[in-house]
């Protein structure tokens, strides 16, 4: 059993589709989970139809959604790191490393969950996960936590091979769907299909939601 899990993502909702089930499992097992979210996703373009937010109010909307998602998963320790959305690739890498390093020093996690650097599609995803890996590379090997890395590019298996860990999360599917629903500003169309039953339970999307796959990051010594 893990002694402490640290989840590091750049945006609210990054945890919802690929990791919410595993996070919930850890919480249910009594494992302490800390979720560090680098930004509030305040530059997101989806503000609803009809509009539920303006550019000025969107940060608070997404902050509340993130808090609701954590409540759904049972995560009590949410850290909002205060970086600006869509700018992580332009931040001083040392500032990102320092910020994450302080969390690692404080929490001493046995496992970190983040995106897989260079396979995150979004520049913020790659910058955030690269900072996590750089932080850990500077640690003594014997103190370094395991990293469950989440690649989301279409070619991930062709390049990286099969995932090292695949978790069936059907036993916590209800909680995972509540987590997805919490981020309504980003998932409104999917939530509508889940709520009205129009999503085929055998669809590729439902299969994706029911299983979570990770690659253990291979540190080059």
List the model feature ranges, each with a label.
Residues 2-8, 29, 76-77, 86, ...:
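Metal-dependent de-N-acetylase/amidase catalytic core
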Residues 1-107, 137-143:
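Active-site rim/loop-helix segments in enzyme catalytic domains that contact anionic ligands
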């Amino acid at each position: 059993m893990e002694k402490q899990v640290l989840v590091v993502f750049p945006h609210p909702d990054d945890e919802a589709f690929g990791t919410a089930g595993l996070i919930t499992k850890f919480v249910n097992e009594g494992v302490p989970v800390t979720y560090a979210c680098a930004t509030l996703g305040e530059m997101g373009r989806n503000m609803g139809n009809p509009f539920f937010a303006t550019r000025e109010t969107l940060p608070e909307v997404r902050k509340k959604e993130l808090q609701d998602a954590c409540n759904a998963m049972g995560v009590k320790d949410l850290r909002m790191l205060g970086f600006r959305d869509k700018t992580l690739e332009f931040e001083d890498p040392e500032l990102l490393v320092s910020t994450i390093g302080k969390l690692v020093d404080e929490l001493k996690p046995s496992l970190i969950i983040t995106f897989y650097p260079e396979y995150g599609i979004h520049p913020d995803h790659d910058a955030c996960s690269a900072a996590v890996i750089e932080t850990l590379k500077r640690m003594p090997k014997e103190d370094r936590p395991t990293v469950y890395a989440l690649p989301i590019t279409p070619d991930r298996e062709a390049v990286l091979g099969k995932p090292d860990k695949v978790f069936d999360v059907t036993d916590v599917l209800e909680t995972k769907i509540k987590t997805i629903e919490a981020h309504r500003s980003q998932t409104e169309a999917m939530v509508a299909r889940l709520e009205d039953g129009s999503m085929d339970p055998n669809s590729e999307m439902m299969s994706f939601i029911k299983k979570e796959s990770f690659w253990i990051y291979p540190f080059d010594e």
